């Protein structure tokens, strides 16, 4: 039977030996937010185009080579692509989180749930801050257990005794462009930004 949820532990992102949060915090200018949908539906968490590379469910892990439950969805996008809050909420954790690499976990109310954004290259929020749906919180990267630039996105819901990750299902794909910018302009800007970065950065 296809499992639609899996128990998950706390993200525990934060200080780590040898890791300096300021080395990845607001290194580049923060992009403009996108319009939300009033928190009626999960907003697609990436500005611009992205390809779904791994769905929620059992999969052969590309690094460890074993069948493991994949507790979220993976979206491939160029490194540095802006990542937005899928719902309004409060930042629970922001920092280095084991296999998730540089990651953010947000908590949302009514109904209570959490969203997780993993393998980031840059952060724009810190624990305790509040964010609005569509606000840029980080950038796509390839940190942690990752085979290339992508966003690992999870939806977590409370269950007796803890939290479970659930299939996030369909995401709102409508407001994908930054306020005042069309999709083509945004993609050209992302391309120019990637060309200006020094090799290996």
Label for each model-derived stretch:
Residues 82-90, 125-140:
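Short, well-structured beta-strand-loop connectors
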């Amino acid at each position: 039977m296809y499992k639609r949820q899996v128990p998950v532990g706390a993200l525990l992102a934060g200080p780590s030996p040898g890791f300096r949060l300021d080395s990845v915090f607001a290194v580049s200018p923060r992009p403009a937010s996108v319009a939300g949908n009033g928190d009626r539906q999960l907003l697609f968490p990436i500005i611009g185009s992205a390809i779904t590379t791994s769905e929620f469910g059992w999969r052969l892990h590309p690094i460890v080579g074993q069948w493991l439950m994949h507790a979220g969805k993976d979206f491939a996008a160029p490194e540095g692509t802006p990542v937005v809050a899928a719902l309004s909420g409060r930042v629970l954790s922001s920092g280095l989180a084991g296999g998730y690499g540089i990651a953010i976990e947000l908590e949302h109310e009514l109904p209570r749930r959490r969203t997780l954004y993993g393998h980031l290259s840059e952060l724009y929020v810190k624990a305790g801050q509040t964010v609005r749906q569509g606000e840029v919180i980080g950038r796509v990267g390839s940190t942690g257990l990752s085979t290339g630039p992508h966003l690992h996105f999870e939806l977590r819901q409370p269950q007796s005794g803890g939290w479970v990750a659930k299939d996030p299902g369909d995401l709102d794909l409508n407001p994908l462009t930054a306020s005042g910018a069309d999709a083509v302009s945004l993609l050209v800007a992302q391309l120019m930004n990637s060309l200006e970065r020094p090799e290996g950065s």
